[in-house]
Amino acid sequence: MCLLALGFLLGILQPASGQFPRACASSESLLRKECCPLWAGDGSPCGELSGRGSCQEILLSRAPLGPQFPFTGVDDREDWPAVFYNRTCQCNSNFMGFNCGECRFGFSGPNCAERRMRMRRSIFQLSTREKNKFLAYLNLAKHTPSQDYVIATGTYAQMNNGLTPMFRNISVYDLFVWMHYYVSRDTLLGDASVWRDIDFAHEAPGFLPWHRLFLVLWEHEIQKITGDENFTIPYWDWRDAEGCDVCTDELMGDRHPTNPQLLSPASFFSSWQ
């Protein structure tokens, strides 16, 4: 699943995300260039014994890159995730995930065959209790380490081509902060040089659908840590807004009264790092 989001923009470059399944962060996986973890339900890679998926060679786009990125072979995100892995789980039917252990969005049940509809509501339609629950869920995600994913703290070259993995733990909330940063950051050219004239997150043809997938995945991870399968992210319709209607201390936080770079100390989020 997290080997899906980043490349929707990048190959838009190729299906994946900037984060790595914990099960694939070992030197063994990197040296084999294979990310096909066992599914706990049957103990086979990608749940193959149960027909969930199989370990397959990744398919790379042959479309040329745009002129705004005049490099080849300098960025780990090119042809993602081929720099790190060339075999990943390809899931069947309504299964998804790095080991095909979960259901595609909109499906549930032991065989992922049951349709599940959820409704997203305007944040201004939520009751006080519902708003407080939403904020509590965000706070839980901020302080809950991700069980499934880690983030890279170095490039593939810095990892000695997989021989010395460089990963660290991260919270569920910060995983998505990092994912968004990873897909949009500058290209590192080596020798402290960077190419700044690129933003795969916001200057690529997948801008809208990638961000939608990004939010649905974030929503899914919060459902998992809270056990609330009915949780949905509320939306803010700002089409006619004359200001930031959600920038209040009851919602996403007002401005600090003396420092416009900070949140109001009365905000739920003012203590976040």
UniProtKB/Swiss-Prot annotation:
Catalytic activity: 2 L-dopa + O2 = 2 L-dopaquinone + 2 H2O; L-tyrosine + O2 = L-dopaquinone + H2O
GO cellular component, one term: melanosome membrane
Keywords (A to Z) from UniProt: Copper, Glycoprotein, Melanin biosynthesis, Membrane, Metal-binding, Monooxygenase, Oxidoreductase, Signal, Transmembrane
Gene3D superfamilies named among the record's database cross-references: Di-copper center containing domain from catechol oxidase
Glycosylation site positions: 86, 169, 230
UniProt cofactor note: Binds 2 copper ions per subunit.
E.C. number(s) listed in UniProt: 1.14.18.1
Gene Ontology molecular functions: metal ion binding; tyrosinase activity
Chief location of this protein within or outside the cell: membrane
One GO biological process term: pigmentation
Family: Belongs to the tyrosinase family.
PANTHER family registered for this protein in UniProt: TYROSINASE, TYROSINASE FAMILY MEMBER
Listed name of the protein: Tyrosinase
Organism: Pelodiscus sinensis (Chinese softshell turtle)
